Design a protein with these regions (language model features):
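Short, proline-enriched alpha-helix->beta-strand connector loops that line the catalytic pocket
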Residues: 108-110, 135
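Proline-centered loop/turn at the N-terminus of a beta-strand
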Residues: 111-113, 188
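Residue-level marker of regulatory loop/turn positions in helix-turn-helix DNA-binding domains and
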Residues: 94, 115, 147
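N-terminal helical cap/lid subdomain that shapes the substrate entry/recognition surface
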Residues: 5-100, 107-108, 119
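Asp-based, Mg2+/Mn2+-dependent phosphohydrolase catalytic module
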Residues: 2-13, 119-210
Length: 210
């Protein structure tokens, strides 16, 4: 009788940043610019949308994206321009429990990498603010590569650049589409919801002590 294939151990962790280690949300800014929550949500759903923002994540300059929207929605010109000019106010802070986990992994010598959908223009603001970004052995920023998740090419680029074995790498992200794309390429994956669940998984993988 054939024996089951042994479980391949996890040797490295590849992290998403926003929503996992960093609390980024445009609402942190726009709740100050709108007195009415419904109006704010309508603006984010129909003007400065997630799809529009992802174009900057994929390399489009903010000045180009902003002026495109101002031409379409001149009544919201000030609010649209604030997305660029006051972008730093969308960063509420670090997800401290997740950062603590990252620090424990680092202390144990686990190779750590990041793969993030982030504007190349705005990522220096994150580097200046979050010292823990220096803990990574490598960070791949979508805006610098002009590729964004869940495009399979950006995962393949991470594999090549960081010399990863997907079957030995745990990918952590809060977006289901990104998790699904990584899984198709052979990564072990974890859909991030809260730090305790991530910690439990890392313990079960043998990367953190019980």
């Amino acid at each position: 009788m054939s024996q089951p294939e042994p479980e391949v151990p996890v040797r490295a962790v590849l992290f998403d940043l926003g929503g996992v280690l960093v609390d980024w949300n445009p609402r942190h800014l726009y709740c100050r610019l709108f007195t009415d929550e419904a109006a704010m949500e309508s603006f984010l759903a129909t003007v400065c949308t997630q799809v529009w923002n992802e174009e900057q994540d994929a390399g489009r300059p903010f000045c180009e994206g902003v002026e495109l929207l101002v031409a379409r929605h001149p009544q919201h010109a000030d609010e649209i321009r604030a997305y660029d000019a006051r972008w730093g106010e969308m960063l509420k802070g670090a997800v401290e429990e997740s950062v603590a986990i990252l620090g424990e992994l680092r202390a144990r010598g686990v190779p750590l990498f990041a793969l993030t959908n982030w504007s190349a223009e705005k990522f220096p603001l994150a580097r200046a603010r979050f010292a823990f970004l220096e803990w990574f052995d490598g960070i791949l920023v979508s805006g610098e590569e002009r590729l964004k998740k869940p495009d399979p090419r950006i995962y393949r680029l991470a594999v090549e650049r960081f010399e990863l074995e997907p079957a030995e790498t745990l990918y952590v992200d809060d977006a289901e589409a990104n998790i699904a794309a990584a899984a198709l390429l052979g990564f072990k994956t974890h859909r991030f919801v809260e730090p305790p669940a991530l910690r439990n998984l890392l313990v079960s993988c043998g990367l953190l002590p019980a």
